[in-house]
Structure formats: C-alpha cells, structure tokens
From Swiss-Prot:
It is an enzyme of class 6 (ligase). It catalyses: tRNA(Phe) + L-phenylalanine + ATP = L-phenylalanyl-tRNA(Phe) + AMP + diphosphate + H(+). Keywords: Aminoacyl-tRNA synthetase, ATP-binding, Cytoplasm, Ligase, Magnesium, Metal-binding, Nucleotide-binding, Protein biosynthesis. GO terms for cellular component: cytoplasm. Its cofactor is Mg(2+). It comes from Actinobacillus pleuropneumoniae serotype 5b (strain L20). Belongs to the class-II aminoacyl-tRNA synthetase family. Phe-tRNA synthetase alpha subunit type 1 subfamily. Binds 2 magnesium ions per tetramer. Tetramer of two alpha and two beta subunits. This is Phenylalanine--tRNA ligase alpha subunit. GO terms for molecular function: ATP binding; magnesium ion binding; phenylalanine-tRNA ligase activity; tRNA binding. GO terms for biological process: phenylalanyl-tRNA aminoacylation. It is found in: Cytoplasm.
Length: 328
C-alpha cells in the first residue's frame, strides 16, 4: 500500500509538471497505464496477494488509478479546447461569402426521356397506365393476337417462370387490361420495364418501353401519322424528316415502322405503330365495327441514345457517375 501511495503521488507530480502539449499527455498515459505501465504492473502484482486481501487492495488500486485518469482526461480536454480556440482565432472567416454548394443528384437519362414523353402525351389528354411486370401468356401473347407458334414465345427470347407466367416482353399487356376495364374513348400512355433474353451493344435483358393506345369511333391512320410527326418534332426539338415503312405486327393492321433522317443523312428507326387489330378489340369485348384504335410502341433507351448521341446501350445500366453526370 505504501508503494501505491508513492506511485500516486509521483503520477500527480508528473502531471502537474507537464507543459501544455497533447503529445506529452499521451506519453504520460502510456508510461502509467500502457501495457507495461506502472499501474498495470501494480495490478499484476495482485496475484501475489492472498485471496482474502486481494479485493480490498484491488479496489484501492483502481480508485487511485481512476483519480489520476480523471486529472489526465480533464487536462486533455482543456488543452484540446485551447488548441481549437487558438485555431479559430487565427482563421479569418468572411460570413458574407456564400456557403459551400451542396452536391445534388440528377435524374437518370432514361427517366428524363420517360418524363419528356409522358409530359407530351399527357398534355394531349392521355392518362398514364401501368401493369404487372410478371405477366401471364394470355396478356403478353394470346390477347394480342400472337399465335402459339410465334417465335417471340421461344425460350431464347422470353424469360419464362412456368408454362403460363413470364417476365413481360412488352408493355402491350397494359393496353389489354385497360380495355377490359374501360369503355371507349380510351387514351393511355404506358411506360414500364420489359424483359428479353438478349445482351449486346444495342440490347439488354431489361429495358424500358412506352406504349400509346387510342380507341374511339373515328380513330384513323391519318391521326396516327400526325400525332407521331408532332411528337418526334417536339422530342428531338427539330423539324425532322419522317418516313413510315410498311411492317407487320400481330396486334396491329395495318402496321408501320417509323424512321427519322439524322444529320448524317441516314434513316434511323425510332418506333413502331399501327391500327389496333380487330381481333385484339374483340378479345376485350370492343366491337371493331363500331370502334377503331391505334397503338404506338417505342424503346425508351433507343430514343435516349438518339437524343444524346449515346453509342452503347449498356452505358445506361453500369452506374458510371462520369457518364450519368453529363445529364444533370
């Protein structure tokens, strides 16, 4: 116990003698409380004390140790505050200067395109519709006049869960569900994710589509052409040369693919369209003798690539901030 008293007194005197300096405090802590410190060695000597005396002596050592630590911590806190005050006093702060700019995120280029397309058609009276991404073969194929032998049903194109369920390959199922639950006139725009088993520079297994459906008593191809002309001019913000090429889609008749002339003089396909096939109208209980309709389907990534001159579709899904920051 005499040794403990002497050690405590020595530690107090050493602390009092320290000049201001955090490094000196750390050296003191290591000397007295480190692995080979004086108080650590004193605690290890308890093994030589009888079991009856050990608790009382151990308590006294801990009490003395804590008293020194309290002084050490108080001195450290005071010196740290003094150092901070000195640093602040030496710094010149102009409170009239603007604060640091907060780094803000931005919309993904695909989201920007979806918003632009939806905004255009919403202003024309179209409402946004959506549907499930896990679809049945009826809504993805049968109701759209796609026969069982159609190549789109093959495993190399479609992700099947079982014989009836799949990841939708197109957003056209939204059109069927809408026509089942609404009476004409119908005007919808349906953006969403779709899935096809393909991956290269111009294809990814997941991508985005936007489909347009208009059903009314006097819907016709002339209206469809005018609508597409106006949309492409607004989307690309230039008076583009547009052409319609005859094509085939099981769910529209007649059908067309739409190309635009780019600055390099080449035609580029941007979307597909056509008049809703009478069989599709019959499948949802709409009389094709009374009503007609037209549909438009476009790939969002393709539109985005053309608008921003992106050459690799996969860039949209690699989360490279150097690429994405260009669209803020």
């Amino acid at each position: 116990m005499q040794h403990l008293k002497e050690l405590t007194e020595k530690a107090r005197n050493a602390l009092d003698a320290l000049d201001q300096g955090l490094d000196a405090l750390e050296e003191f802590r290591v000397e007295y409380f480190g692995k080979k410190g004086h108080f650590t060695a004193l605690m290890q000597e308890l093994r030589n004390v009888s079991a009856e005396e050990r608790p009382a002596i151990g308590a006294k050592i801990n009490e003395a140790k804590q008293a020194i630590l309290d002084i050490l911590n108080a001195k450290k806190e005071a010196w740290e505050q003094e150092a901070l005050n000195a640093k602040l006093a030496a710094e010149s702060i102009d409170v009239s200067l603007p604060g640091r700019k907060t780094e803000l995120g931005g919309l993904h280029p695909v989201s920007i395109t979806i918003e632009r397309v939806v905004k255009f058609f919403s202003e024309l009276g179209f409402t946004v519709a959506s549907g499930p991404e896990i679809e049945t073969d009826y809504y993805n194929f049968d109701a759209l006049n796609i026969p069982a032998h159609h190549p789109a049903r093959a495993d190399h194109d479609t992700f099947w869960f079982d014989a009836q369920r799949l990841l939708r390959t197109q957003t056209s199922g939204v059109q069927i569900r809408t026509m089942e639950n609404m009476q004409p006139p119908i005007r919808i725009v349906a953006p969403g994710r779709v899935y096809r088993n393909d991956y290269d520079q111009t294809h990814t297994p997941m991508f985005h589509q936007i489909e347009l459906l208009y059903v009314d008593k006097k819907a016709n191809f002339t209206e469809l052409k005018g609508l597409i002309h106006d949309f492409l001019k607004a989307f690309f913000e230039e008076d583009l040369q547009v052409r319609f090429r005859p094509s085939f889609f099981p769910f529209t008749e007649p059908s067309a693919e739409v190309d635009v002339m780019r600055q390099n003089g080449k035609w580029l396909e941007v979307l597909g369209c056509g008049m809703v096939h009478p069989n599709v109208l019959r499948n949802v209980g709409i009389d094709p003798e009374e009503y007609s309709g037209f549909a438009v389907g476009m790939g969002v990534e393709r539109l985005t690539m053309l608008r921003y001159n992106v050459t690799d579709l996969r860039s949209f899904f690699e989360n490279d901030l150097r690429f994405l920051k260009q669209f803020k």
